Amino acid sequence: MLRFLTAGESHGPGLTIIVEGIPADLPLLAEDIDRDLARRQVGFGRGGRMSIETDRVTFRGGVRLGRTIGSPIAMTLENRDFKNWEVPMSVSPVDLDDEAVRAQLEAKRITRLRPGHADYPGAVKYGLADVRNILERSSARETASRVAAGAIAKQLLRQFNVHVHSHVVEIGGVGAGESVRPALPTFEEWKDLFERVDQNDLRCHPDLYERLRSRVVEAAKGGYTLGGAVELAAYGEIPVGLGSHVHYDRRIDGLLAGAAMSVHTVKAVEVGIGTAAARETGADVQDEFINAAGEIARTSNHAGGIEGGMTNGQPVLLRAYLKPLPTMRKALRSIDLVSREPFEAHYERSDTCAVPAGGVVCEAMMAIVLAQELQRKLGGDSLGEMLRHAGRTHA
């Protein structure tokens, strides 16, 4: 079954991604992955690094002649900024007798703790006096690896007409509580929504764009950051019964929520109407069954496509809430890890708003969980075998 591992630091030579368990004979090109990597880098309010890095994946194994071969897929992403960090991020020991080398190391040493980051707990956990080693791995640069792995999961899901996408629904409180889509979108309506969303740099419905953009501009001028919310949707031919009710760790809502919560800055996740269900009566939040020309159908999708820990055939809907980035031009109060002296927190290059990019990363994690559960249900070592088990003759 699909699993993945990533390695690499934010300012190191690059990122390495290994994806295991993908069936043989899945069509896969670098462009399939680069497309999502580019979507991750889009976003009004992104910082300077997006002008430095243009991510292009390189396959190192597991793919031959444009198709997977059943072995682990190895990929790398280059960090173009590494040329400016070769000494402080050197893998090999450096000459500490060289004054210039010592100066470069000292310039990149961080002891001033940044509130809201992994700095303090990481330094304590690993016994470090320099937070650089924590910052490098906890950086959101790592999410490029997840997007690469998720793009492969999406490609597998597409063979079964399952599609995963996201759109920004709120930034800095603007858009909260509004609905920009039909209550029960058709496949074509979902497709049209996401085509329109990907045409702007906030990855939101056009009706929200100007208001969200103005909010980001306001924050950039004020030197502060903004969070927001994204809706995640898996739509198409969603199989009934992904996940299970039999154990806590097999319930797909828990798996999906956990995957989304693992994304940097995500602080809350809702399934379906989420917290709104707590304010309604039982009769108001259930999705009633109807007979639609002999087919079982529903009058609503308040459950977000999940009942009893299993998919029920409707679109799977989640909403992820992302906090404002903790790194700001307006420094926060902190202390020095070593001296305990008060300081203004260290400023590392950052974004004003990373919510659009966060949606793409959450998509990747959602796709990985759905692909894992699809494999668990269907089995098979090749795409053809999986398709046969699903009763399909072709993708």
From Swiss-Prot:
Cofactor binding notes: Reduced FMN (FMNH(2)).
Residues at which FMN binds: 137-139, 308, 323-327, 349
Co-factor requirement: FMNH2
Keywords recorded for this protein, A-Z: Amino-acid biosynthesis, Aromatic amino acid biosynthesis, FAD, Flavoprotein, FMN, Lyase, NADP
Annotated Gene3D superfamilies: Chorismate synthase AroC (3.60.150.10)
Classification via SUPFAM superfamilies: Chorismate synthase, AroC
Binding site for NADP(+): 40, 46
Pfam families membership: Chorismate_synt (PF01264)
Gene Ontology CC, one term: cytosol
EC number per UniProt: 4.2.3.5
Pathway(s) this gene product operates in, as recorded in its UniProt entry: Metabolic intermediate biosynthesis; chorismate biosynthesis; chorismate from D-erythrose 4-phosphate and phosphoenolpyruvate: step 7/7
MF annotations from Gene Ontology: chorismate synthase activity; FMN binding
Function: This reaction introduces a second double bond into the aromatic ring system.
Assembly with partners or alone: Homotetramer.
HAMAP family the UniProt entry points to: Chorismate_synth
NCBIfam families noted in UniProt: aroC, PRK05382.1
Annotated family: Belongs to the chorismate synthase family.
Name of the protein in question: Chorismate synthase
Organism annotation: Gloeobacter violaceus (strain ATCC 29082 / PCC 7421)
Record lineage: Bacteria, Bacillati, Cyanobacteriota, Cyanophyceae, Gloeobacterales
